[in-house]
């Protein structure tokens, strides 16, 4: 199947990897993730030349207080450059939503955004402030420049020698636009706040994988957006991380974890 996907032109897949913890997967009903070694499965997909983008969640009732540390190790081991991490949201029509209604823990109808609101629509088992701080720590660590570029390098290391997807930097479609992208990335990112990590990544990637220029540059440009967005979420005064959750005050009784 993977070979056929490559032949058909697939170069990326999104997987709901969720969490490395078995009890949290069982709670979520994600039993398919328990039937295989997820790390090896992801590596197998990557070895065919397909990038894996992963979705990860924290906020399950069975999540331990150190859930952020578990997720950080998991994401780095998977070598998924783009990790979409969100707080658990209870959606109408799901078993989770119905259970939370019965337990009196539902707070509101979700907006559908579980990655930027920094809020939850139900009362979690552990203190909400603690959970949001864990989420903040998780984002902060996986999108540190060094950690992000390490995942990119490891992913490039896992690619086959010859990737079927054409590299426009080395093919007949090479153009001045490609040169402009490369030069803009180099000058903009070299003199950015993470310039050292960027240069280290670019140099090592070009030396090890001179045949994968397009992917190398794409990850660099993508990284600029992800690192900038993460800093904005974490360190801007207007960020929801710096706002209280008034509608929750007085309603939360935390269970011992």
Regions found by a protein language model. Name each.
Residues 1-176, 189:
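A structural motif corresponding to the C-terminal lobe/cap of the Radical SAM core domain
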Residues 114-257:
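Auxiliary Fe-S-binding modules of radical SAM enzymes
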């Amino acid at each position: 199947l993977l070979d056929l996907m490559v032949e058909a032109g697939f170069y990326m897949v999104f997987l709901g990897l969720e969490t490395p913890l078995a009890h949290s997967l069982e709670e979520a009903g994600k039993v398919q993730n328990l039937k295989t070694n997820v790390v090896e499965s992801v590596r197998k997909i990557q070895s065919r030349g397909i990038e894996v983008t992963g979705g990860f969640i924290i906020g399950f009732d069975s999540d331990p207080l150190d859930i952020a540390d578990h997720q950080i190790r998991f994401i780095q081991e998977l070598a998924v450059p783009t990790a979409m991490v969100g707080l658990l949201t209870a959606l109408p029509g799901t078993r989770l939503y119905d259970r939370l209604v019965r337990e009196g823990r539902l707070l509101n109808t979700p907006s559908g955004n579980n990655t930027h609101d920094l809020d939850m629509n139900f009362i979690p088992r552990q203190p909400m402030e603690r959970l949001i701080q864990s989420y903040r720590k998780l984002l902060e660590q996986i999108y540190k420049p060094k950690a992000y570029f390490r995942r990119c390098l490891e992913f490039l290391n896992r690619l086959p020698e010859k990737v079927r997807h054409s590299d426009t930097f080395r093919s007949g479609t090479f153009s001045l636009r490609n040169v402009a992208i490369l030069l803009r990335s180099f000058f903009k990112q070299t003199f950015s706040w993470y310039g050292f990590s960027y240069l280290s990544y670019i140099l090592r990637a070009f030396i090890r994988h001179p045949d994968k220029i397009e992917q190398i540059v794409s990850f660099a440009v993508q990284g600029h957006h992800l690192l900038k967005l993460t800093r904005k979420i974490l360190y801007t005064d207007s960020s929801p991380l710096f706002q209280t959750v008034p509608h929750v005050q007085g309603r939360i009784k935390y269970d011992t974890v």
